[in-house]
Amino acid sequence: MSKKQKLRDRLFGSPPPRDFSWSQLVSLLHGYGINEKSGDGSRRRFYDPSKPEVPFLHMHKRHPDDTLLAYQVENVKAFLKEWGYHK
């Protein structure tokens, strides 16, 4: 099983992960071809350059703790499902 598959299974597993890190999120999204762009301060935007019709996924990178909050995990899951990255 590849790293992307393990991260995807973990993200979409039940119950949702409470310790999914920012670096794991970036790694998973890069596996789908989604790039990260830094904004002001801790703001980050994720976009797919091969699919301009897909809107940006806007996120706030937490600090100093880089663990995603529950609502962030749900937002990522909804984004990936809505735009066909995950079935």
Regions of interest found by a model, annotated:
Residues 19, 40, 66-70:
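Short, well-ordered coil↔helix boundary/capping segments
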Residues 31-61:
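A short, structured beta-strand/loop element
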Residues 54-87:
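Long, intrinsically disordered, low-complexity Ser/Thr/Pro-rich regulatory/activation regions
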